[in-house]
Amino acid sequence: MENGTDELWHQFAYPFGPHPDGAVGLCAACRRLGHCRLGLLAEELDDSGGMRAPIRVPIDAEGGPGVAHGGWTAAALDEVLGHTLVLHGHFAVTGTLTVRFVKPVPIDRDVMGTARIVGHEGHRWSISGELTLATTGALLASAEGVWVERGTDHFDRARSWAAEQDAMTGPEPSA
C-alpha cells in the first residue's frame, strides 16, 4: 500500500450498481475495516430511482455532548448522495456540496439517508438528499450538490498530479 491506496483502487474494482443483498459499497479504507465507518448499514434504490440508506450514527462521530460533529453530517450526506449514482452504475466525484444543518444529529441513534437525482447535463449530475431521524422522520440535515462523472483513470491522474506537486517542492529547507 502506498499513500493510502491499495491494489483494489489501482485495479478500480469498485462495485457499481445495486448489491443484491442491499450491502453498502465500501471505499478502500472501509473495505479494510469491513464496514462503513460513517455508519451506513445498507443501501437500496426505491421504485422511483431514489436511494435509501439506514445509518447508525457512530459514537466516535461525537462533536458536542451527545450529538454528531457537523463534519460527520456533511460526510454522511456526501456518501449518501454520491452512492445514489453508484447504485445507478455511474462513477462520479463530488464537485459541490451544500449542507443545511437543521437539528443536532444524535449519536448512537438510527437515521435514514435518502437521495434523488434531480438533474443531469453532460457529465454533471445534480443530486439532493436528507438525513432524518429514523424513529420520527424529523429532518436533521439536507444537502444538494453536483457530481462530475469521471473515467476509471481518475485516481491514476490524481496520483500523477500529487507526484508533480511533490516534485515542485524540492528538498525541505534546513533550519
Predicted regions and their residues:
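HotDog/MaoC-like acyl-thioester-processing domains
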Residues: 1-19, 105-107, 118-175
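Hydrophobic beta-strand-centered segment that forms part of the acyl-chain substrate-binding groove
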Residues: 73, 79-112, 117
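A generic structural signal for short beta-strands and their flanking turns/coil linkers
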Residues: 23, 36, 49-53, 93-97, ...
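Short, conserved micro-motifs enriched in small and acidic residues
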Residues: 67-75
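Catalytic strand-loop segment that frames the active site of acyl-thioester-processing enzymes
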Residues: 22-68
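Short beta-strand micro-motifs enriched in acidic
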Residues: 43-45, 116-120
